Amino acid sequence: MSKSICSTGLRWLWVVVAVLIIDLGSKFLILQNFALGETVSLFPSLNLHYARNYGAAFSFLADSGGWQRWFFAGIAVGICVVLAVLMYRSKATQKLNNIAYALIIGGALGNLFDRLWHGFVVDMIDFYVGDWHFATFNLADSAICIGAALIVLEGFLPSSDKKTS
């Protein structure tokens, strides 16, 4: 028995497209308008700062000689496939989980595109307090973190709310 895509979690794939457009658009603007290492202050505690990340979160394995590019690309593809299957198997009415999965897929694909096209991930958001700076990140990273937080949140909701949220 075949399911209509609109009756499955794949109905929420538009979120993936939105994340990709916003993420890749922001990275394009940075690449076109910033020199590597350039910083522009937006607000107190928030800068735009063009950085290249050859590793994963917090530049994990960034200095590993290049193999990590393909390793992290493979992980991204695997995660996207698993989450797309989960979306297909879930009902479209399971909004919270499906939106979370779509945010993670969109973020993973945004960073995957960077890895494959540029050989590095473009980062640009620099949050700081005083002299302490958080790791520079991008909108794809934000989408992944928000998606993961939504999955954790869903785990704390009562089961009656999970069916409709």
Swiss-Prot record:
- Coiled-coil residues are none
Q: What is its EC number?
A: 3.4.23.36
Give the transmembrane region(s): 12-32, 70-90, 102-122, 137-157
> Can you name this protein?
Lipoprotein signal peptidase
InterPro entries in the record, alphabetically?
Peptidase_A8 (IPR001872)
Give a short account of what the protein does: This protein specifically catalyzes the removal of signal peptides from prolipoproteins.
Q: Which reaction does it catalyse?
A: Release of signal peptides from bacterial membrane prolipoproteins. Hydrolyzes -Xaa-Yaa-Zaa-|-(S,diacylglyceryl)Cys-, in which Xaa is hydrophobic (preferably Leu), and Yaa (Ala or Ser) and Zaa (Gly or Ala) have small, neutral side chains
